[in-house]
Amino acid sequence: MATLKEVAGRAGVSQSTVSRLLNDPSFSIKEETRRRVLRVCEEMGYRNVFRPAIAVLDAPPSGEELQDAYFADLRKVLAERAESLELDQLTFIRSIHELTERATEFDGFITVGATVFPEADLRALHMVLPHGVCIDTNPAPRLFDSVRPDLSQTMLDALDAMIAAGRSRIAFLGGVGSIMGMHDYPEDIRELSFRQWAAHLGLETDGLVYSSGTFTVENGYRLAEQLVADHREAGSMPDGLIVAADVLAVGALQALNALRVEVPDELAVVSVNNQSIAWYTSPPLSSYAIDQRELARMAFSTLIDGLKHERRVRR
C-alpha cells in the first residue's frame, strides 16, 4: 500500500497538505492541487488514515547538561514514533506564544521540558489549540491531557528494595518541582510519594529528606554534602539514599566520594531515570528506568484519540 510520503512526493506537495486535504473539509487549497492530490491517491490506491499535523512544544533547556540529555532523548523518541506512524515531520517550537500564534498550522501538540507556563498563556493556547498532551507533568489538567511515569510506584519499589537489602534508615534527596495544576509546589511527586510510602512502611523520615533547589549536578553535590554534615558526627547517618533523578545522583556520588563515604557498603544509593551517565559513575549507580518509548507511544495515542473523537474529558 502506498504511503503518505509517496503520495505527497508524486503529487508535488507536502505530507501535511495531503493529510489536511483528506481529513479537514475546511482546508483551503487550489482546486487544481486538490484534484491532482486526489487523482494520485486513487492511482496509487492510497487508503486514507488519520494523520494529524502535530507540534512539539519543546520548553527551553535548563542549561544543565545531564537534565537536558533526558529531554534530548525524549525528543528523539517522539520523532521516531511519529515516523513509525507515518505522520508528517514534527514541528518543534520553543515558545508557547509562537505555538499560539501558529495554532492554525496544527491539529494538536505534545509538550516536553520542565518549564512552568503562566496560567494566562495556557488558557490562550487552549482557546486556539484545545488538543494537547503534556509529558512528565501537567500544568493544566482541566485543559490538556497528560502522560506521566508512575513515580509513586517507583518510590515504593525503591523503598522495598532498600528494606529487602537490610537498610532501615533511608534518606531522600530531591529538588523543587511542579506537579499538577497551575501552581508551583515546594515538593514534587517523588518527595511526596517517598514521605507517604515511608510512613506507610513505618520508616522514620524526620531530618532525612533533603529536597530543595534545582535538578542539577551542583545541587546534588550540595545536598549530599549537607546530609553528611548533619548526620556523620551525630552518629545518625542513613544507610540508604534514594535520589529523585540521575542528574542529582551524579553530584551526590561526587560529594560522597570526596567525603569518603563508602558506597554502597556504608550508604546504598539508588536513583531515577537510568540515563546513560548512570552506567559510568564510580561506583556504578543503580537507577530505575523511565520508559520513554512507552511515554511517546501513549502521548501520540492519547492525542490522536482526542482528535478523532473530539474528546472533552481529560486524561
Please give the residue ranges for each predicted region.
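Alpha-helical recognition/docking segments in bacterial nutrient-uptake
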Residues: 53-160, 164, 233
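Flexible loop/turn connectors
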Residues: 229-315
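Periplasmic-binding protein-like
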Residues: 55-56, 105-113, 171-174, 210, ...
